[in-house]
């Protein structure tokens, strides 16, 4: 499956490209006194630029994703296009170093960069009928794995549950100006809750996912989680419980309007 070409995609998306782009963005934002959000930050050098800008008083928000904290470029060799993403996965030493910026507060929140595609899209063929990673779209599913991945791997590395809640819930709500309607358990806030069983070990299997893109969910297959989501509550209504989605809740979602400041 074009594994030999897999690293070609990684090599053409080197960290220097990300570093240069973020350096320019921070300069432009500073010149016009504009807040800026840096998403999917994958290299420690780029993180260092953001950390320095914050220390100098710039309004900078930083997001990264579980796969940049946990997967290195060897996964592209192993899974080919199924591990292709933008920015590309980095070297192992880069991956572990990113956790320093999670711990010191440089990273404001963790996204999923959930990118669902059909298997036929991921396995694009070239003119000779061969699968070609360069024709495959970038990204893979991850929205349902963000919480168990961050709890499991974060606790291993000394990140507290309180900090994980900030990264996954509180800070995203603040970033998009929907706090305190979202992102907090308090009077007047929406009754949005995730009930997590911390005594339940779960093995990640794509076939258990509710995502329609589970056919391309390969990179975390077989990973062990120290917790499992028991229930999800949206505006006071239980929409998921003990492995089952309440299909009658379809349409229960509402547009969340940001508060303009």
Protein language model features and the residues they cover:
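Single conserved hydrophobic/aromatic residue that forms the stacking wall/gate
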Residues: 1-11
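Generic enzyme active-site microenvironment
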Residues: 38, 61, 111, 195
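Helix C-cap/helix->beta junction micro-motif
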Residues: 32, 53-56
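C-terminal cap of metal-dependent C-N hydrolases
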Residues: 124-132, 190-255
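Active-site loop ensemble at the mouth of alpha/beta enzyme cores that anchors a bound cofactor
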Residues: 58-59, 66-104, 109, 116-147, ...
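Residue-level signal for inorganic ion chemistry
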Residues: 36, 63, 113, 150, ...
């Amino acid at each position: 499956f074009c594994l030999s070409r897999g690293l070609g995609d990684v090599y053409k998306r080197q960290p220097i490209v990300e570093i240069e782009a973020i350096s320019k963005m921070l300069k432009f934002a500073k010149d016009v006194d504009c807040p800026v959000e840096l998403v999917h930050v994958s290299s420690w050098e780029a993180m260092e630029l953001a950390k320095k800008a914050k220390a100098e008083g710039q309004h900078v928000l930083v997001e990264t994703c579980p796969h940049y904290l946990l997967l290195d470029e060897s996964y592209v060799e192993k899974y080919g296009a199924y591990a292709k993403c933008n920015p590309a996965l980095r070297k192992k030493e880069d991956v572990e170093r990113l956790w320093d910026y999670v711990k010191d507060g440089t990273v404001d929140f963790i996204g999923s960069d959930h990118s669902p595609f059909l298997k036929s899209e991921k396995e694009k063929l070239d003119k000779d009928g061969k699968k070609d990673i360069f024709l495959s779209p970038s990204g893979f599913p991850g929205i349902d794995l963000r919480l168990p991945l961050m709890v499991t791997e974060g606790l291993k590395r000394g990140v507290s549950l309180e900090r994980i809640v900030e990264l996954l819930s509180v800070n995203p709500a603040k970033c998009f100006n929907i706090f305190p309607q979202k992102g907090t358990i308090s009077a007047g806030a929406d009754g949005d809750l995730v009930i997590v069983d911390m005594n339940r070990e779960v093995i990640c299997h794509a076939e258990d996912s509710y995502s329609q893109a589970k056919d391309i969910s390969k990179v975390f297959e077989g990973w062990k989680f120290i917790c499992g989501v028991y229930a999800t509550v949206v505006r006071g209504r239980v929409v998921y419980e003990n492995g089952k989605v309440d299909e009658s809740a379809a349409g229960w979602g509402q547009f969340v309007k940001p508060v303009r400041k």
